[in-house]
Swiss-Prot record:
GO cellular component: actin cytoskeleton
PANTHER family, sorted: CALPONIN, PROTEIN CBG16761
Keyword Lipid biosynthesis included in the entry's annotation: no
Tissue expression notes: Expressed in pharyngeal muscle cells (at protein level).
InterPro entries for the chain: Calponin-like, Calponin_repeat
Start and stop residues of the Calponin-like repeats: 29-54, 73-98, 119-144, 161-189, 209-234, 255-280
Biased composition (Basic and acidic residues): 321-332
Protein name: Calponin-like protein clik-2
Disruption phenotype: Recessive lethal. Severe defect in pharyngeal pumping.
Function, as annotated: Required for pharyngeal pumping.
Gene source species: Caenorhabditis elegans
């Protein structure tokens, strides 16, 4: 579907995709996401329920279920045909210690009332000391010995705490001036005779946090906003109060770079999370997009402002400059070569002077050096005469 719309023939006009064609593939799931055309669990019961595999068949259709097995639990779910706890007491209740068996023919039901008072040793024993008559679970234990028959109502020690729980007879925190409650600050001010501190002076010290808990008199985060709020570092700096309110609000639509940015490439306009990717090789919208792109390039070439680079070859402008620079450099090299070809006065060679200094000490080479100097002087005189002749000829011309 859609191949004829994107054919390369130029005789027929290009067709457009209709809404029905565009939505034609919405009912199909791609293979990478699965499929909805084969065996499914459509119509199944809720999660964890047994599957109905005997009442419905693809070929025979609906099959009437056999209700004879509805009173029997399958073995994989358990069974209700053997020994059970039917008729037992609730969870956590004491188990009947007297056998109560009715499905054994040879056993008789025994109801020994004498044995119901005694707990067997495997479960414990209540014939000795117990907690019968104690208070509820977690209550304070009565530290005074409750001995039956001897001072049963003696309350003389009820106001004294035994040492295993502490004591209330020595130094305590009773009468502290701080408000009651866990974690209250202890009042450490001592009352000195002749130097009584009034209540106003005592309350004035509650404004300050003591040093061992920190302090509340220096730089804080008071008024900085809610938790994880971006800190406003512009208006409260030195000179920030002079900034106008309009300038302060300009940066409110920009996400700072430390948290990311909303000014560059993003995935805005993408499909929803988890949407299958379009894996078709010949997508019509791609070819249409390329054609629109080429048309936009052509329009730009026709209406581009003077001096701008070509969109097809954006580096052509720099290429021309490079060629001009290379041609000017080559012309300079040619002019230098022409100047070098002109006759120039020969300069005395340094190598010959060095050799003359080395040969001064040799007496045998003095004569040769004198001859060479005479020859050089003659050559210089000849060159000067030639130059004078050339100048005279130029003046005559």
């Amino acid at each position: 579907m859609g191949e004829e719309d994107w054919s390369d023939t130029q005789q027929q006009p290009r067709k457009r995709w209709t809404l029905e064609q565009l939505k034609g593939g919405n009912t199909f799931l791609s293979q990478q996401a699965g499929t909805n055309k084969f065996e499914t669990q459509k119509g199944m019961t809720a999660v964890g329920m047994p599957r109905w595999n005997i009442t419905k068949d693809k070929k025979q259709g609906y099959i009437a279920p056999d209700q004879r097995s509805e009173n029997v639990l399958r073995v994989q779910c358990g069974t209700n045909q053997y020994a059970s706890q039917k008729g037992e007491t609730p969870i956590g209740a004491s188990r009947f210690q007297v056998p109560k068996v009715t499905y054994k023919k040879e056993w008789e039901t025994i109801l020994d009332k004498e044995g119901e008072k005694i707990i067997p040793k495997q479960a414990g024993d209540y014939g000795l000391a117990s907690q019968a008559g104690e208070v509820s679970m977690g209550g304070h234990r009565n530290q005074v010995a409750l001995i039956r028959g001897r001072l049963p109502h003696d309350r003389r020690t009820h106001g004294v705490l035994c040492f295993q729980n502490g004591t209330n007879l020595f130094a305590s925190q009773t009468g502290m001036s701080a408000p009651p409650g866990l974690g209250a600050v202890r009042q450490a001010t001592q009352k000195i005779e002749g130097l009584e501190l009034g209540e106003d002076i005592l309350r004035r010290g509650t404004e300050f946090t003591p040093w061992y808990s920190g302090q509340n008199k220096f730089a804080t985060q008071a008024g900085s906003g809610g938790f994880l709020k971006v800190r406003d570092v512009l208006p409260h700096t030195v000179g920030g109060k002079d900034i106008e309110e309009e300038l302060k609000q300009k940066s409110e639509g920009i996400v700072p770079l430390q948290s990311g940015t909303n000014k560059l490439a993003s995935q805005r306009g993408m499909t929803g999370f988890g949407t299958p990717r379009n894996t078709q090789l010949r997508a019509g919208w791609k070819k249409e997009w390329i054609e629109d792109y080429e048309a936009a390039l052509k329009e730009w070439e026709e209406t581009k402002p003077p001096g701008s680079a070509s969109s097809v070859d954006p580096f052509g402008h720099y290429k021309k400059k490079f060629e001009e620079r290379e041609s000017s450099r080559q012309s300079e090299i040619d002019s230098q070569s022409v100047k070098a070809s002109e006759p120039v006065e020969p300069e005395p060679e340094e190598e010959e002077e060095e050799e003359e200094e080395e040969k001064i000490e040799e007496p045998a080479a003095k004569e040769e050096e004198e001859e060479e100097e005479e020859e050089e002087e003659e050559e210089e005189e000849e060159l000067e005469e030639e130059e004078e002749e050339e100048e005279e000829e130029e003046e005559d011309e």
